[in-house]
Amino acid sequence: MVRIYTLTLAPSLDSATITPQIYPEGKLRCTAPVFEPGGGGINVARAIAHLGGSATAIFPAGGATGEHLVSLLADENVPVATVEAKDWTRQNLHVHVEASGEQYRFVMPGAALNEDEFRQLEEQVLEIESGAILVISGSLPPGVKLEKLTQLISAAQKQGIRCIVDSSGEALSAALAIGNIELVKPNQKELSALVNRELTQPDDVRKAAQEIVNSGKAKRVVVSLGPQGALGVDSENCIQVVPPPVKSQSTVGAGDSMVGAMTLKLAENASLEEMVRFGVAAGSAATLNQGTRLCSHDDTQKIYAYLSR
């Protein structure tokens, strides 16, 4: 199978806790924190590991929080290729409120990357073998301009590395401007921004996705449609997969789980239909969990079997 790598420029060490209720000024008693790796590409690599595959996570790691992050990934059998960073890896906080069932996500700025640290990450990427898949996901940290990221994607493509970009806004537009991106996964609102018009009907969404494929910007576009599942388009096919009704607990890990599952199928040279089905299954499986947990292998396989009937 084709080897998979992920790139996360702004990784995080995520801590989750529970408190009975939230109110201002007073001390809020919380449960002991649970620590998990965080960051777009890292979570994609974790989802792939949960599903029985393997992806090497490339990222900067700094300070004690960076060491803790690397240790947690080792516990999940996720191979890593890290660059030592001067600034400590950021730490995010997720709080679940028992009384209301609400979740609060406190997201810190990514640790700044200097030019030398980015250059080392670039070297890690350009050592990837031709034909391998690289998933670029997550936000840009301070010190890294969008131009640097697009130059890295272009350089990787010239070496035969197949790039998947899971981003939004200017970063997604800039990546598509390079062209020949293996896969993008915008939601309907993001797709509307990409084609610069409102998309109100299902056929509008399909046509917009096909425009991006036909223009050569991306080989595959999978539009996330929330409860309506996802619409997948390539040069020859168009398919919509609607998930079964499930008791959703949290949507936090759904997107990264979906990208991980689709990447795994892409590495297996599966059809567009199989890829979208497996992605929707993993995304739905992730919503069964509370907090920030990703998809599980068993839940994903059960939903995938249901969708494949």
Curated annotation (Swiss-Prot):
Recorded superkingdom: Bacteria
Q: Which amino acids does the record list as binding K(+)? A: 250, 252, 286, 289, 291, 293
Q: Per its UniProt record, what Pfam families does this chain match? A: PfkB
Query: How is this protein's activity controlled?
Result: Allosterically inhibited by ATP. Allosteric ATP-binding requires the presence of the substrate ATP. Inhibited by monovalent cations with ionic radii larger than Na(+) (e.g. K(+), Cs(+)). The monovalent cations increase the affinity of the allosteric site for ATP. PFK-2 is sensitive to inhibition by fructose 1,6-diphosphate.
Essential cofactor(s):
Mg(2+)
Q: Where Mg(2+) is bound, by residue?
A: 190
- A cellular component term (GO) from this record? cytosol
The top EC class, named as a word, is transferase
Q: In which pathway does it act?
A: Carbohydrate degradation; glycolysis; D-glyceraldehyde 3-phosphate and glycerone phosphate from D-glucose: step 3/4
User: Which reactions is this enzyme annotated as catalysing?
Assistant: beta-D-fructose 6-phosphate + ATP = beta-D-fructose 1,6-bisphosphate + ADP + H(+)
Q: Which InterPro entries does the record match to this protein?
A: Carboh/pur_kinase_PfkB_CS, PfkB_dom, Ribokinase-like, Tagatose/fructose_Pkinase
Function summary: Catalyzes the phosphorylation of D-fructose 6-phosphate to fructose 1,6-bisphosphate by ATP, the first committing step of glycolysis.
Subunit structure, briefly? Homodimer.
Into which family does the record put it?
Answer: Belongs to the carbohydrate kinase PfkB family.
Q: Which NCBIfam families match?
A: 1-PFK (TIGR03168), PRK10294.1 (NF007632)
Q: What is this protein called?
A: ATP-dependent 6-phosphofructokinase isozyme 2
State the organism of origin. Escherichia coli (strain K12)
The record lists the lineage as: Bacteria, Pseudomonadati, Pseudomonadota, Gammaproteobacteria, Enterobacterales
Q: What's the gene?
A: pfkB
